[in-house]
């Protein structure tokens, strides 16, 4: 039993040692691979990381000045000093949240148009000599070298960076098209007709005069544009018609209009049946207008838990003017819209704001008297004339009263 235990222990120890050896080998290989990757990155980015601008920092920079800005894990990048007003509000708020404002400078990276706030220690001026030094010694990537070249071109031409960028990235095909001169249409030479025995010529369908006219009338670009404009002008409807057409239309329109009849009860009964629909339509419109006036007055002056304000009184004044000048009030409209019952309540109101200015109480009472002339008991027949009610109209109340016969 002791021998078996020792053998099993030996096996376990061997397995543990083998596992340790495998782990050490993996660590060694991993370190080697990481070292080789780092060496490759250093070879690629060696020039970028080693490059430091030769210019000295300044205390302040002008807006629009070209600089070299440095962010963590990035090389020195060409940029431009931006003012806070030129940056959009959303971008400005995001920058203030993500970057520190202490001794920070607003910078716009070129040509990506990205903004950032960078400390003044990581911002250096970009001069023409420094940019030429970058290009001559190949101290950055091709992308940065191209932007530096555009900056030099903008400084020489005294133009903004965006204008130079547009000229640089303009396709060559468009330039070639612009450089090519416009070719003029060539005139075709008309050859003479062949001769036949006897001195006769072949008779063409078109004579020489017609051929010369067609050659002269050959369309050019300008003539085609003018022709298209004239065709469109002829096809499009003219905004101002001729005076003859307008005169005809006016006469025709005037003849088609029908005069509205007078809205008295006797006149309505004398009319033929064909006009009943027209009367009903007009009556419906008048009913809706008076009903709207009633709702407005009731909401302002008689609504629950609402005391009328001075700002509402001008609107009340306008509604009363509309009712006073309404020329077609009759008993049916007063009963259906319940306007008469509303004014019986309005007369009882007191302490109306701006009553001295608009004289509401007296106007309510006068309108109520006018409405009483139209309202009759159901037993009596309607003999009241529906004359128009004006603001200064005098209503004969005696006509509304029934005649009493004394014996």
UniProtKB/Swiss-Prot annotation:
GO terms for molecular function: methylated histone binding. GO terms for cellular component: NuA3 histone acetyltransferase complex; nucleus. The keyword DNA damage applies. Residues 172-208 have a biased composition (Basic and acidic residues). Residues 63-129 form the PWWP domain. Pfam families: PWWP. Coiled coil: none annotated. The modification Phosphoserine is found at residues 160, 162, 236, 238, 242. Residues 1-46, 163-248 are annotated as: Disordered. Keywords: Chromatin regulator, DNA damage, Nucleus, Phosphoprotein. GO terms for biological process: chromatin remodeling; DNA damage response. It is found in: Nucleus. Component of the mst2 complex which is a highly specific H3 lysine 14 (H3K14) acetyltransferase that functions together with gcn5 to regulate global levels of H3K14 acetylation (H3K14ac), critical for DNA damage checkpoint activation. Component of the mst2 complex composed of at least eaf6, mst2, nto1, pdp3, ptf1, ptf2 and tfg3. This is PWWP domain-containing protein 3. The lineage of its organism: Eukaryota, Fungi, Dikarya, Ascomycota, Taphrinomycotina.
């Amino acid at each position: 039993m002791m021998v078996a235990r020792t053998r099993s222990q030996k096996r376990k120890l061997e397995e543990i040692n083998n596992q340790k050896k495998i782990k050490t080998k993996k660590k060694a290989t991993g370190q080697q691979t990481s070292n080789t990757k780092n060496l490759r990155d250093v070879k690629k980015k060696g020039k970028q990381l080693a490059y430091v601008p030769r210019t000295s920092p300044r205390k302040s920079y002008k807006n629009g000045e070209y600089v070299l800005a440095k962010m963590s894990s990035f090389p020195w990048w060409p940029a431009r000093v931006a003012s806070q007003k030129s940056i959009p509000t959303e971008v400005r708020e995001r920058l203030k949240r993500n970057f520190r404002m202490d001794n920070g400078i607003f910078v716009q990276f070129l040509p990506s148009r990205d903004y950032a706030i960078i400390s003044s220690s990581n911002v250096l001026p970009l001069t023409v000599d420094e940019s030429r030094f970058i290009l001559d010694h190949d101290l950055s990537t091709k992308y940065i070298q191209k932007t530096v070249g555009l900056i030099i071109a903008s400084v020489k031409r005294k133009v903004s960076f965006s204008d130079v960028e547009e000229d640089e990235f303009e396709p060559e095909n468009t330039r070639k098209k612009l450089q090519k001169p416009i070719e003029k249409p060539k005139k075709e030479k008309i050859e003479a007709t062949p001769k036949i025995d006897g001195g006769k010529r072949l008779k063409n369908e078109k004579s020489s005069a017609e051929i010369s006219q067609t050659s002269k009338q050959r369309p050019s670009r300008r003539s085609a544009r003018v022709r298209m404009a004239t065709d469109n002008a002829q096809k499009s409807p003219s905004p101002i018609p001729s005076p003859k057409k307008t005169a005809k239309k006016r006469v025709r329109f005037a003849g088609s209009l029908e005069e509205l009849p007078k809205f008295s009860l006797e006149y309505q009964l004398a009319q033929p049946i064909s006009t009943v629909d027209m009367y009903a339509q007009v009556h419906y419109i008048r009913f809706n207008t008076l009903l709207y006036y009633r709702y407005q007055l009731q909401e302002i002056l008689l609504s629950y838990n609402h005391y009328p304000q001075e700002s509402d009184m001008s609107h009340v004044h306008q509604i009363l003017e509309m009712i006073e000048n309404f020329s077609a009030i009759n008993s049916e409209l007063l009963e259906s819209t319940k306007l008469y019952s509303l004014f019986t309540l309005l007369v009882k109101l007191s302490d109306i704001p701006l009553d001295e200015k608009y004289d509401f109480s007296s106007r309510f009472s006068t309108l109520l008297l006018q409405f009483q002339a139209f309202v009759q008991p159901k037993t009596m027949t309607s003999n009241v004339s529906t004359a128009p009610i004006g603001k200064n109209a005098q209503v004969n109340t005696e006509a509304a009263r029934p005649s009493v016969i004394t014996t």
